[in-house]
Design a protein with these regions (language model features):
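Membrane-embedded alpha-helical bundles that constitute the cytochrome b-like, heme-associated redox core
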Residues: 2-150
Length: 150
């Protein structure tokens, strides 16, 4: 029985690390393509904008799916956050979660056809910048664990 639990725990940890590395890659692709799209809005051609827009949507949808899986894997953290408050829990993680929720919401609104230069589009851009900063902080705090998993 102990061996079975050990194997199960190893599988869970391996899955968490696979999801974490996939999250990192999809985050980088989404952030890079979002910044590229913003730069394209300042004068580059329509074809390039269409390519990067499609790329950004794809990378961001993969990111959204992975974040949902990641949150599910760490659901106890969120459950305790709602039950007992922030306490000594990571404020960066809590704010990052909120920013991501807002960023994903504005992204979905933009997907529905809202103009990216609208107020929602501008909010999406600034939330994206905040997300990049907070995600980098979140990643650096966990970097040693990510590397040790390789």
């Amino acid at each position: 029985m102990v061996l079975k639990n050990k194997t199960r725990n190893q599988t869970i940890m391996k899955n968490k690390f696979v999801v974490d590395w996939a999250l990192l890659l999809s985050f980088i692709l989404s952030a890079f393509s979002g910044i590229k799209l913003h730069m394209l809005g300042h004068g580059m051609g329509h074809g390039a904008c269409r390519f990067w827009g499609t790329f950004h949507i794809g990378a961001s949808l993969v990111l959204l799916l992975l974040v949902i899986i990641h949150v599910k894997m760490h659901w106890n953290w969120y459950k305790h956050l709602f039950q007992k408050g922030l306490g000594n829990k990571s404020r960066t993680t809590a704010v990052l979660s909120l920013i991501f929720l807002l960023l994903a919401s504005t992204g979905i609104i933009l997907l529905e056809g809202e103009c990216r230069r609208s107020a929602i589009g501008i909010w999406h851009f600034y939330l994206g910048i905040a997300m990049i900063i907070l995600a980098v902080m979140h990643i650096f705090k966990r970097w040693a664990r990510l590397i040790s998993a390789l």
